[in-house]
Amino acid sequence: MKRLPILLILGMLGFVSCSRPAQESLKPRIVVMTDIGPAEVEPDDNESAVRLMAYADRFEIEGIITTIGWNCDPYPEEWAVYLERVIDAYEVDVQNLMKRSGQKGFRTPEMENATQELGYWPSADYIRGRTVMGSRRAGIGVIGPDNDSPGSELLIRLADEDDDRPIWLCSWGGANTFAQAVWRVQQERTEAELKRFLRKFRLYTITDQDMVWAMRMNRAYSSHQWLRRDFADDLLLVWDESAWLNQNELGKANWDKYERFIQGKGEMGKVYPKFLWGVEGDTPSFLNVMPNGLNDPDDPEQVGWGGCHRFGLSPDGETSAWTNWQQPLKDISNAYEHKFYPDEFNDFAARMQWADTGAGNLNPVVVLDGNTGIKPLEIDARPGETLTFDASRSYDPDGDSLTFDWWFQEFPGQALYPDIDQSSGAKVRVTVPGTPGAYHLVCEVHDDGPFRLPAYRRIIVKVP
């Protein structure tokens, strides 16, 4: 289905490649499971779908699966038309969005179904071809021989592909479709093969929505509990109970900005509905994977735009997951979610301006000690050592001026942090404490153009 030989002409994109792209230049792989529906029932999934399409150059969208959630059981098949409306709007706006990266056209279907590099905008037909129906009934009770779906079959095919990148499952509704795929593999393959299957995936759930709203506290009803209980050793599962709530509430508090900068901007802005319960509550599931240099999502303790999480007891009181519902982590994650909200909104608003007009601001590029990547830099240091970091070669594609802010991420139980000299300059000196540990320094950069766009780079200072 994917991963065709790369020794092909890339077609109309405007450049030619004759070898497999470097791993860091490839997009992260994601699959969305959404209970999208009418705006008067489920507006936030429509909103999150618009934002996802505005970032289609940052994610390899392997699938969008329509499925059950708090508002529906069974999932009405006709609701999938609301996802189609967003994709249709993207088909119009992508002609402007491609101007952000100088893209002149789309690759052939065969090449679009191979790997995609960061910056490539896929065609609407590519996304349509990966939009399928998943489980239409909720709960662990329906998992079994009669619950296979195009969505569960897609997940199995994706896991079987020759691709080392993990697949992030963004659960906007229930993850019942994935649970069915796990069950099917468990029935038909060896234990070792099941483990390999599970280790291909990372699951980020927006609370637990594998049931209707009235049953939301019945954790045992959900297939998520089965996944956490039986597969915790092999499946990275994030159960968020902070970022989605803040996304909802901060969006409501700032709705005037959505009316001004999001709604009506391009065709996608025209299908971005007014909130009902909250704004884009599902968006943190893919913001967590955003390849912007702030975090490595494979380490959920690293804070990103989707919050931060620590492995421990989940809200059901029985199973464990990467979560943030307990103190002190809940307050820490909450503070960072408030801190980053202006950045992630402004970034979105700037992209919607591109969708509308084909022009706009571009993000700065962090160059840290001569390195332009986005993966965290790891530095070994001695207790008491002074380290120097230089981001002075960072630049803005539009020629905007840059400001710098350096800070250490707060972790529960970490009492001492290195001292930073000149935390607002392009160069900093850091004095390492005598206490062993890993200290996470973030270089945060903003331009002074419209929407004051951000860029980040993380440095992990390891002290033995």
Protein language model annotation of sequence segments:
Residues 20-388, 394-416, 427-429, 438:
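N-terminal acidic, glycine/proline-rich low-complexity segments
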Residues 446-452:
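Short, solvent-exposed loop/turn segments at the edges of extracellular beta-sandwich modules
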Residues 452-459:
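Extracellular and select intracellular beta-sandwich modules with Ser/Thr-enriched
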Residues 419-424:
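Short beta-strand segments within Ig-like beta-sandwich modules, predominantly Fibronectin type-III
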Residues 460-464:
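Short beta-strand edge segments in extracellular beta-sheet folds
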Residues 1-4:
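Positively charged n-region of N-terminal signal peptides that target proteins for export
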Residues 6-14:
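Bacterial N-terminal signal peptides
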